[in-house]
Amino acid sequence: MSKSRTPSRVRNTEPVTFETVRRLALALPGVEEGKSWGTPAFRVGKKFLARLREDGDLVVRVEFAAREVLMGAAPETFHITDHYRDYPAMLVRLSKVDPDDLRDLLEEAWRRNASKKLLAEFEEGRDR
């Protein structure tokens, strides 16, 4: 989700589950599923993108400025705890997030961490 885009105001009716997260994350080139802190996580190369927390929230890598915008626009969906205050990450309540917003968040996290080769492959695939 770009800094200028705020979360969707009209919620998509598709319920977001971890299977939704998995499908969206693994659709991005080079993303692999593994474990982080004992829960499912996604990385591109060795770089963290997202992980499921024990409480069911999703931790997503996000720039600080974008995090502030999103938390201000939809605090019921996007939040942090003190633990994440100094990290470029944000918590996402899967029960509240719109699937399109989640897809955008995961794609932006991926774009910031993917290799130039993977980025080129992704863009080439979009042009087809």
Regions of interest found by a model, annotated:
Residues 1-128:
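Charge-dense, helix-prone N-terminal extensions
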